[in-house]
Amino acid sequence: MSELFETLKSFFYNDEWFYIEVESRPVLRLNHWGENGRFSCQAEVNEEQKIFYFYSYFPVNVPEEKRSVIAELITRANYGMRVGNFELDYEDGEVRFKTSLDVENVELSHDLVSNHVYANVWTMDRYLPALFGVIYGNISPKDAVEQIEE
């Protein structure tokens, strides 16, 4: 495996994150317990392009009848977001928060990984109540985002 991937593994090991390494690709699967809930994560390296991706996954797939309101919520949340973005897969209802770092000609340090990972999981944890509220509590996307961003 590459030096980039070894840096990721070292960071997660030293920071006491349990991970499972995917055999066929430079991917780590992890879990995170935030203040608002538990969700799965994935750290991935694109070796050719020298990009580090980190994803946090909303813990349930959005029911088909709620996907349009979740798309509105995500659009409202993404507007003005400085780091990362939410994504919705309309096919299966998967919601994830993605951050990425282009590390071509840059050393991927433990500090860079830490800043990248913790910004990601903090954001997903912050928006969990909004996502759950729109899906299960019939809160409007606008109200849900306003409550989070107050």
Question: Predicted regions span which residues?
Answer:
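Amphipathic alpha-helical segments
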Residues: 1-19
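Short, intrinsically disordered, mixed-charge
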Residues: 14, 72-80, 122-129
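Ser/Thr-rich, low-complexity intrinsically disordered terminal regions
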Residues: 15-39, 43-52, 59
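Short small-residue beta-strand/loop micro-motif enriched in glycine and branched aliphatics
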Residues: 51-55, 105-108
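Short, internal acidic amphipathic alpha-helical interface segments
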Residues: 57-94
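Long, contiguous binding/interaction regions
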Residues: 67, 89, 99-100, 113-126, ...
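Beta-strand/loop substructures that line and gate deep hydrophobic ligand-binding cavities in soluble
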Residues: 93-106
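Short, highly charged C-terminal tails/helix-capping segments
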Residues: 132-150
